[in-house]
Amino acid sequence: MQAQRSERRPDRNETFSGSIEFTIPVDLAAWQNRRTTQAEAISAASVLIKYAATEALAGRDPIACPVHLTILAFFLPPGAAKFRRGDLCHTGRPDTDSVAAVIMSALDGIAWKQRGQVAELLVMKRYGPRPGVAVVIEPADDLMTMATAGEA
């Protein structure tokens, strides 16, 4: 006879609270590498994103409420010293909408039911010591509550 798990799995209709955060050690600059096709690089990144999201959700069902998605992409700086200080934004390829599209597509059905649930989106590209992507998913309802509380 198997022992029952003591932790309760959240119901599909339960409101989502808190935030889900995870990082993916992926080099987005590889999307522009001529040796591998862009489709192969994006496919490999999608697998990493799906795995990281599945681990972060820890068995929860996809979120049913509107969400705020924050994406922070880090790229290795070029050799110039001014880039190594970390105070400059990355302005090269891939562009922010491409980064967001790949991440949002990979999270469909895992983090949320459909990508239309992303009500707020913030994408930042920076130079950093290691390439990678940090993703934070928060309920958009909580952000609206905080914004309207200041108006009262």
Predicted regions and their residues:
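Acidic, proline/glycine-enriched N-terminal capping motif
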Residues: 1-152
